[in-house]
UniProtKB/Swiss-Prot annotation:
Catalytic machinery residues: 8, 10
Pathway the protein takes part in: Amino-acid biosynthesis; L-histidine biosynthesis; L-histidine from 5-phospho-alpha-D-ribose 1-diphosphate: step 6/9; Amino-acid biosynthesis; L-histidine biosynthesis; L-histidine from 5-phospho-alpha-D-ribose 1-diphosphate: step 8/9
InterPro entries: HAD-like_sf, HAD-SF_hydro_IIIA, HAD_sf, His_synth_bifunc_HisB, HisB_N, Histidinol-phos, IGPD_sf, ImidazoleglycerolP_deHydtase
GO cellular component: cytoplasm
Major localization class: cytoplasm
An MF annotation (GO) of this entry: imidazoleglycerol-phosphate dehydratase activity
Alphabetized HAMAP family for the sequence: Bifunc_HisB, HisB
Coiled coil: none
Organism: Xylella fastidiosa (strain 9a5c)
Enzyme Commission code: 3.1.3.15, 4.2.1.19
Region of interest (Histidinol-phosphatase), ranges: 1-168
GO biological process assignments: L-histidine biosynthetic process
Name this polypeptide is given: Histidine biosynthesis bifunctional protein HisB
C-alpha cells in the first residue's frame, strides 16, 4: 500500500503573494525547504497529490492563461529535481459557492477514497491554513499546518519530513484463542528494555535476551493453558511476536534486511562460524544465526539437546518457537548450535538471533532493499 501526502499549493509549495493569486511568473517563489523535504518523503515511499482552491479560476477575475504558465513552470521545477505529483486537484469555485469540492470539503477525493491501495494510516495533509487541517480531519489523516505570517501554524518542511519519514517503528498485537491470550508491544527504535510475563520464567529470560541484544523495546504478556502443556503458550508467543515485528517494519524501506557477521579472515573460520552467520560463543557452546526479512518465511534449525527441558521450557519447543517466529514475521532464518550444556545452547540460540536481528533491523536511509520493489 502507498502512503500519500496531499499538499496545498499556494503558501505551501510556493510562497503566497499579498493578493493571494500567483498569476505572473515574477510571483513564483518556492517555499523554503520544500524540495529536500519532498525528496526525503519520496525516498521513504510517499506519493504526492496537490489539492488546491483557486478562487474563480477561469473567470475574468482570474483567467486560466494567467494560472497555467506559472503553474506549469512550478511543476517543471519540481520535476527537474525528481519530484513528480501523482495528481493535481483544483477547485475553481468561490468561497460563497459552498461547493463540496472546495477544501475543507473532500468532494475532489472520491476516486482516492475508493482506492484500496492507499495507506491511509501513513498518509497526511500539508497546508498553510486551518481549512487544510479541517480537510485532513475530514479524511481522517494527519494534518500539518506550515508556519506562515498570515495564518500561524507550527511546522516547517524539515520537521514534517522528519516526522513522516523517520517515524518510530512500533506495533501492538493482541492474539486471542481458546488456548492463549497474548499481547505484544514492540518498538524497534526504543531504548532496549523488556517486560515479559508468560508464566514460564526460563522462557521469559530467553525473550529478554531478544530485547537486550537486538536493541529493541519489548513487552509481552501471555496467559496460556499451562495446566495442559507449554506448547500453546510458546508457539503462540512466537506467532504474536513475529506478527508485531512484521507490522512494526512496515514496508521495510531503509532496513539492513539481512543479519550476518562481517566477513571473517580464513584463520578465524571454524565450526558453525564457517556458515558465515552471526556467531556467538557461550563458554563451550557456539551458535550461529543468519536471517533475511525477505517476506518468504523459512526456518532451518541445526542442533540437538540431551535434556528434555531447561528450566520450565521443553527443549523440543526451542526450534518450534523459532519456526513460529519466522512464519509470522516473514523471516528466513538459519540457526545452528553445538555444545555440551543445553542451557548454554538454548540461550546462545536466542542471543545469536537477537544480534542478527539488530543488524537486519537497522535503518540506512529510505531505500527499499530489493530490486523487486516490494518485500
Amino acid at each position: 500500500m502507498t502512503p500519500i501526502v496531499f499538499i496545498d499549493r499556494d503558501g505551501t509549495l510556493i510562497e503566497e503573494p499579498p493578493d493571494f493569486q500567483i498569476d505572473a511568473y515574477e510571483k513564483l517563489r518556492l517555499v523554503n525547504g520544500v524540495i529536500p523535504a519532498l525528496l526525503k518523503l519520496r525516498d521513504a515511499g510517499y506519493h504526492f497529490v496537490i489539492v488546491t482552491n483557486q478562487d474563480g479560476l477561469g473567470s475574468p477575475a482570474y483567467p486560466q492563461a494567467s494560472f497555467d504558465g506559472p503553474n506549469a513552470l512550478m511543476l517543471q521545477i519540481f520535476s527537474s529535481q525528481g519530484i513528480v505529483f501523482r495528481d493535481v486537484l483544483i477547485d475553481r469555485s468561490w468561497p460563497t459557492d459552498n461547493a463540496p469540492t472546495r477544501k475543507p470539503g473532500i468532494g475532489l477525493m472520491v476516486a482516492y477514497l475508493q482506492d484500496r491501495d492507499i495507506d491511509w494510516a501513513r498518509s497526511a495533509m500539508v497546508g498553510d491554513r486551518p481549512t487544510d487541517l479541517q480537510f485532513a480531519e475530514n479524511l481522517n489523516i494527519r494534518g500539518f499546518q506550515l508556519r506562515t505570517p498570515q495564518f500561524g501554524g507550527d511546522w516547517d518542511w524539515d520537521g514534517i519530513a522528519h516526522t513522516l519519514a523517520d517515524a518510530p517503528r512500533r506495533a501492538v498485537v493482541q492474539r486471542h484463542t481458546k488456548e492463549t491470550t497474548i499481547r505484544v508491544e514492540i518498538d524497534l527504535d526504543g531504548a532496549p528494555q523488556a517486560r515479559i510475563t508468560t508464566g514460564l520464567p526460563f522462557f521469559d529470560h530467553m525473550l529478554e535476551q531478544i530485547a537486550k541484544h537486538a536493541g529493541i523495546s519489548l513487552q509481552i504478556s501471555a496467559v496460556g493453558d499451562l495446566h495442559i502443556d507449554e506448547h500453546h503458550t510458546i508457539e503462540d508467543t512466537g506467532l504474536a511476536l513475529g506478527q508485531a515485528v512484521r507490522q512494526a517494519l512496515g514496508d521495510k524501506r531503509g532496513i539492513g534486511r539481512y543479519g550476518f557477521d562481517p566477513p571473517q579472515l580464513p584463520w578465524q573460520v571454524s565450526g558453525a562460524a564457517a556458515h558465515g552467520g552471526f556467531t556467538l560463543p557461550m563458554d563451550e557452546t557456539q551458535a550461529s544465526a543468519v536471517l533475511d526479512f525477505s517476506g518468504r518465511p523459512y526456518c532451518v534449525f541445526e542442533g540437538t539437546f540431551v535434556r528434555e527441558r531447561v528450566g520450565d521450557m521443553p527443549t523440543e519447543l526451542v526450534p518450534h518457537f523459532f519456526r513460529s517466529l519466522c512464519d509470522a514475521s516473514g523471516m528466513n532464518l538459519h540457526l545452528s548450535v553445538h555444545g555440551d550444556n543445553d542451557h548454554h545452547k538454548v540461550e546462545a540460540c536466542f542471543k545469536a538471533l537477537a544480534r542478527a536481528l539488530r543488524q537486519a533491523l537497522q535503518r540506512h536511509g529510505h531505500v527499499l532493499p530489493s530490486t523487486k520493489g516490494a518485500l
